[in-house]
Amino acid sequence: MAGELVSFAVNKLWDLLSHEYTLFQGVEDQVAELKSDLNLLKSFLKDADAKKHTSALVRYCVEEIKDIVYDAEDVLETFVQKEKLGTTSGIRKHIKRLTCIVPDRREIALYIGHVSKRITRVIRDMQSFGVQQMIVDDYMHPLRNREREIRRTFPKDNESGFVALEENVKKLVGYFVEEDNYQVVSITGMGGLGKTTLARQVFNHDMVTKKFDKLAWVSVSQDFTLKNVWQNILGDLKPKEEETKEEEKKILEMTEYTLQRELYQLLEMSKSLIVLDDIWKKEDWEVIKPIFPPTKGWKLLLTSRNESIVAPTNTKYFNFKPECLKTDDSWKLFQRIAFPINDASEFEIDEEMEKLGEKMIEHCGGLPLAIKVLGGMLAEKYTSHDWRRLSENIGSHLVGGRTNFNDDNNNSCNYVLSLSFEELPSYLKHCFLYLAHFPEDYEIKVENLSYYWAAEEIFQPRHYDGEIIRDVGDVYIEELVRRNMVISERDVKTSRFETCHLHDMMREVCLLKAKEENFLQITSNPPSTANFQSTVTSRRLVYQYPTTLHVEKDINNPKLRSLVVVTLGSWNMAGSSFTRLELLRVLDLVQAKLKGGKLASCIGKLIHLRYLSLEYAEVTHIPYSLGNLKLLIYLNLHISLSSRSNFVPNVLMGMQELRYLALPSLIERKTKLELSNLVKLETLENFSTKNSSLEDLRGMVRLRTLTIELIEETSLETLAASIGGLKYLEKLEIDDLGSKMRTKEAGIVFDFVHLKRLRLELYMPRLSKEQHFPSHLTTLYLQHCRLEEDPMPILEKLLQLKELELGHKSFSGKKMVCSSCGFPQLQKLSISGLKEWEDWKVEESSMPLLLTLNIFDCRKLKQLPDEHLPSHLTAISLKKCGLEDPIPTLERLVHLKELSLSELCGRIMVCTGGGFPQLHKLDLSELDGLEEWIVEDGSMPRLHTLEIRRCLKLKKLPNGFPQLQNLHLTEVEEWEEGMIVKQGSMPLLHTLYIWHCPKLPGEQHFPSHLTTVFLLGMYVEEDPMRILEKLLHLKNVSLFQSFSGKRMVCSGGGFPQLQKLSIREIEWEEWIVEQGSMPLLHTLYIGVCPNLKELPDGLRFIYSLKNLIVSKRWKKRLSEGGEDYYKVQHIPSVEFDD
């Protein structure tokens, strides 16, 4: 395999010498001789690659060739850049600094001669070791030819890998839907067995999605961080409307304690299914599980190679162990992938190939992953001869008869997976090895990956009939997906592969091969020792999740070509001198905090750089020397918004190779950037007329993605003339922030036939006719358009539209009509800020696939369409509308699961029997006019979560809710005692959350089976413990600003099941805990209670207590030797919190 990678490098060097031949004037003879030597060298490499496994001497020769070729490429490419850029201001001085590498033309001639001699010597050595000369094909066919040759091995759906799993899925779904006895289910078995596939089928099963109102999927991995796992779970469980960048940032900034508290509360109040995929150790589960409350609303599915993850003594736990596929099922799976046909009559399997296939799948040991990879590999081989060769390779490796299902199964499967790598063409080997940069279970952005590949010239778009880098990257990912080596699916809105990742076992192969080839050096915590510096010999270096990186101290490898940081948060860049890294092609400093906010001017010395990313980095000043980087194809300056004022010099016009450019969102107004020369751009983000001229866009005819801010005064004619010729656009966003542009009566006409996503925030009183809209449009967002005519008759004819958002002031009319059969593909409709809209008519069969409807701040809308609101709606949010009583219309929607009503104006709300048959969650917020709510028997039979906020005139809850498990009440000051929870109602209620109620209900009005109670902002005068401690099943209590008295007592025998108690911001002075109170308490948190004189003496009798978190002011008293240490000395963990 190394031979093929070296052959790839040889071809790159050949290309350099051929394409830049005119620059080698004066050394033409030496160049011609070197090219001849390279041709001869290529003819030996294939046989050398085959023999390196059995000969250490041949292996040494291959490694020496790699060094020769890479060194030659570094020197000759620097020479080429010297010739190209030597006359550019600032470059001549820099090139002189490279005299140690490329001094002058005479010495370059001597160097080329030296390289030729080294090649001659290594060829002679290989011949003496028995390596033979062979005729080889070109290393890479043009993309178009390969596309014609590629056999389409997969159907459009992904059922090809779904063999013999139906019964397992059915059984597992039963544990989550029908069985209440099991709260935790694990799927365990060896890698590649299909555990994740099985879990995914359960996670997406219709019965499961109907059962739970919240779902979260988190990949844990071998080297996970607890904080990251909790962040991902919280991100999945948060309500959809909160999924903003601000919310994401808030979650990322949470401490572990805050995350644990948020998740604990969220899981107590919801019916959730959490999947933790790929847990490695029992200890990992032990540190994750504190977020799970003792209540029964949640369920957990684990996958692991370790059967002892959860203690089997837990009666709520069940372990499911799938078996390897039997021979017949193995053959069925293999056949679906290696011979993908819809009709058996279309294709007859060659008898010899069938026998060879049956023989080879024996080595897969019934592992689905190994079978799929083998099938994908053989699907690319067309002849019996190819199949025989692969069969012999497998057989020769597995000596000693290791072919039995149970005989060294892992070794057999690992070799099958390794062989799939060996069978890749050389360009795909490089692509695959690049995936070793990323941590386990990391979602890799395919767009970034494509530009990494292009920057290292793994592919060169100029070879492929004008294809853009993103297109070529998609083709390569598709080939790896087809071979079952990479996991990814095309996004339905963009038709592209947006993210990808590796199966665990394929990642092990990837890391192993990358290590064998010295392809990449991986480190997680950058050491600054000379010992580390001396060990970094790879030409690629990646830091995973660093906290600090000092370039000068941590990196000392002048041959380094790629430096990449992979992180989920910000990190400190202590030093940014790149003077020793002048051969870098790729530099990714995502989310770096640069010292002083300045990018060092020495960045301009990296003249080989093709990829530079400062995405979300904290930097305010970009140096003028950036203009030296003439070879950049990717430049991301979308820096952190915390950098309010950013200086970018006008040096970008010389970067004529740029394909991707993201500018800062905020640039100093005085800065003017000339961009007209960047005609090869494929993506341009954050273009602003404040800093650039619209006319610069005219020549960027290759653009696929364009986002524009119109700030300076402009005209529609200028805009149309500037972007009208960009016919390949797929995504366009135009935001008018003060251009005072006014459109003509006919609206804006864009002839973008490939456009899929369009966002317009500008004045546009008329829409173009539907024939002028791109026919492939899938996503449309309109805002501030002030459309005078109903937009629906035009928009509903966009046959591919899946998401439509009519934002603030997008329509100024009164009536909208959605016609019969209109919007045939629409799945999500959002309407907000339409001040004059008052009438909405929906005809039968309109929007037949609509799932989500959001209407916000449309105060004149009095009612919803009575008859033909799409019946498949599953989620509806209505806020700040003039609707008086939408319930009669909504309760007929038989698939509705989530309903949120906020700031409506009705006085009475009646839910009739049989209505809302599938509703799981109901949120009523700020219904100021609501005085009475009636729920008839049989209404909302599946409702398990009810949230009521600031419904000030509503005095009590209605009867009913037989399945309700979570009740959340906020600001119910006027409710009568006893009306919060009526005795005998809500028999399954286990979580109660009350905020701002001046009086605590009597104990007879609390359901006796409550397990969780949160009291917030109540300031009740009487001791709440007197009532709460009598709730025999209570396991979690949280009191926040909920007691205004001075003394609280927990009586002996009280709180018999309590496990967690949290008390914050209470003015109490004395707390007494009698012996025998809270005998099962394991976690106690006391925060910001400044008047509490001392912790109760009774804590020393709570032997179950494992975790105590208190204010730092208690540290002296509770530490060893302190006066109250005796109260807490038995507690394993005592933390002092701010």
From Swiss-Prot:
Induction: In cv. Columbia, regulated epigenetically by EDM2 (e.g. alternative polyadenylation (APA) resulting from cooption of epigenetic information at the TE insertion locus COPIA-R7) to accumulate upon Hyaloperonospora arabidopsidis isolate Hiks1 infection. InterPro entries: Apaf_helical, LRR_dom_sf, LRR_R13L4/SHOC2-like, NB-ARC, P-loop_NTPase, RX-like_CC, Rx_N, WH-like_DNA-bd_sf. It comes from the Eukaryota. Signal peptide: none annotated. Disruption phenotype: Compromised RPP7-dependent immunity leading to an increased sporulation of the incompatible Hyaloperonospora arabidopsidis (downy mildew) Hpa-Hiks1 isolate, but normal resistance to Hpa-Cala2 and Hpa-Cand5 isolates in cv. Col-5 background; full susceptibility to these isolates is observed in cv. Wassilewskija background. LRR repeats lie at residues 544-565, 566-581, 582-606, 607-631, 655-680, 681-705, 707-726, 727-752, 754-774, 775-797, 798-825, 847-871, 873-893, 894-918, 940-963, 1028-1050, 1055-1078, 1079-1103, 1115-1138. GO terms for molecular function: ADP binding; ATP binding. Residues 166-422 form the NB-ARC domain. ATP binds at residues 189-196. Keywords: ATP-binding, Leucine-rich repeat, Nucleotide-binding, Plant defense, Repeat. Gene3D superfamilies: 1.20.5.4130, Helical domain of apoptotic protease-activating factors, P-loop containing nucleotide triphosphate hydrolases, Ribonuclease Inhibitor, Winged helix-like DNA-binding domain superfamily/Winged helix DNA-binding domain. GO terms for biological process: defense response to oomycetes. It holds the Pfam family NB-ARC. Disease resistance protein required for incompatible interactions with avirulent strains of Hyaloperonospora arabidopsidis (downy mildew), isolate Hpa-Hiks1 in cv. Columbia. Belongs to the disease resistance NB-LRR family. The LRR repeats probably act as specificity determinant of pathogen recognition. This is Protein RECOGNITION OF PERONOSPORA PARASITICA 7. It comes from Arabidopsis thaliana. The gene is RPP7.
